């Protein structure tokens, strides 16, 4: 897998437009890759923001991105290698949803308790147990597809989870890292980043 971290200038007008529209940000990320990707490729990304700065964390399985201009990304290659009982720090920005009935639309899950339950269920399916987690409400992200594709904007409820997990099933965890967790993976959700428990680096 290939991990890329790109620092963004939040004072740049183009960056401001992308940060205000999840669909525009999706298009910006995908513009770094060839139009035709291998069928088994999966591009995941996460926007990280704080006062006065922003960065994009991007993950691809096999395709290296390209770019022009004054970008100085950090690029590393990693391969998931976990073992049962291993403790790892994690970060995940997700769009917690549930199905409204057997065939109904997906609706946002709301509230700290429901978000934690959602994470626990996803962890069980993805081969890990949550040992500790902080939950941050990131609000609702909005995106606008060009007409006439969609008349209504994209609205995504975003929640960030940071904490520690224990590996239960290394193969399932590796699959979750490669392919993401939850919905809205094309719009900055689902990238599960893992690191050592004594490090803030993901």
Predicted regions mapped to residue ranges:
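RNA-interacting cores
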Residues: 1-202
